[in-house]
């Protein structure tokens, strides 16, 4: 393999030695290193199983999508195979949410784990073509994956009649152009087809009508990387990792005001407090935690640090992204950064999200600068409440959520800004 100097030195730590087993150091692992460590043995085992059996194992493992929604992976695969082929498999590597860099570490350091997972997943759903849609800002990852695919072909793990099984598969890598919205599965499919990355109305869902109008499974990088372990260990043993209903390893990218930012591989019965203080070393300067942002999705206060890092109704959920804010941070300023992110990333397809995200950020900036009138405050509240119920896709559905949560959990901080602008005329 060639040298990839652009690989960042992200700190990685694991208590499970699974997804991050070979990803602790910032370098690419070749196929020979992967094979020495038992790589592609899960594929050999899978090709001696029926596709139906593999889907059943993944379903029984309780593996959930690691891209944010937490939908049961086995159920998604079952829905796909109910529809006649040809079928397609897509790896969603368009990781673009604030503070999220967990998939990157697999792509850039252990690409063959991902490729093995894609081959097994494609075999299970009966797909002969698979696509990796990678974020445009990951140039090293793009070339690493292309080289790794060529390595796998030379060893007989890709192409025609893989390992003499009669199963054929080609994997193609496509680069995004920096649009966060293309992480939404239907917008991703539109982009792959050469169209503008706009989400589709659902139903039909991609498992019914996806790429080129055919049944398509879209799974996240981390989700796919779990598949070889389910096959090699067996679903029963896999379910012993973490809580039985939310089994398997989970990657948590941690950033913000912590001593050891990085990616941590932990079971999902770990608490948010443990992630911050036991693994990430606590806060900088030992300051008090004010809030934790789950990427740009949710806001948790310091009173909620004992929640589990799982997908239960009271769990942390999402992508597992942890952004720590301390008592030194301004919650309104942080909320403004989130509003600006959504303003920049809305695709503009539907009016509620296009106009709503712009107005939300514009009015919030006026609030932050102390220039908001009472009408501005009322307008901000109205816009924030109405983006979600009237938007087409998930981006609009969550564009105001974290900001609303800061209003509810930190009313005293917002009140300070309200008092600043109380003397302004209407």
Swiss-Prot record:
EC category: translocase
Binding annotation for NAD(+): 65-74
InterPro entries for this protein: NADH-UbQ_OxRdtase_51kDa_CS, Nuo51_FMN-bd, Nuo51_FMN-bd_sf, Nuop51_4Fe4S-bd, Nuop51_4Fe4S-bd_sf, Soluble_ligand-bd
Cofactor binding note from Swiss-Prot or TrEMBL: Binds 1 FMN.
Xref: Pfam families: Complex1_51K, NADH_4Fe-4S, SLBB
SUPFAM superfamilies found in the cross-reference section: Nqo1 FMN-binding domain-like, Nqo1 middle domain-like, Nqo1C-terminal domain-like
Known cofactor(s): FMN; [4Fe-4S] cluster
Keywords on record: 4Fe-4S, Flavoprotein, FMN, Iron, Iron-sulfur, Metal-binding, NAD, Quinone, Translocase
A molecular function (GO) term: 4 iron, 4 sulfur cluster binding
SMART domains for the chain: NADH_4Fe-4S
Residue sites binding [4Fe-4S] cluster per the record: 347, 350, 353, 393
Binding site for FMN: 176-223
Job of this protein: NDH-1 shuttles electrons from NADH, via FMN and iron-sulfur (Fe-S) centers, to quinones in the respiratory chain. Couples the redox reaction to proton translocation (for every two electrons transferred, four hydrogen ions are translocated across the cytoplasmic membrane), and thus conserves the redox energy in a proton gradient.
Family, as annotated: Belongs to the complex I 51 kDa subunit family.
Name of the featured protein: NADH-quinone oxidoreductase subunit F
Organism classification: Bacteria, Pseudomonadati, Aquificota, Aquificia, Aquificales
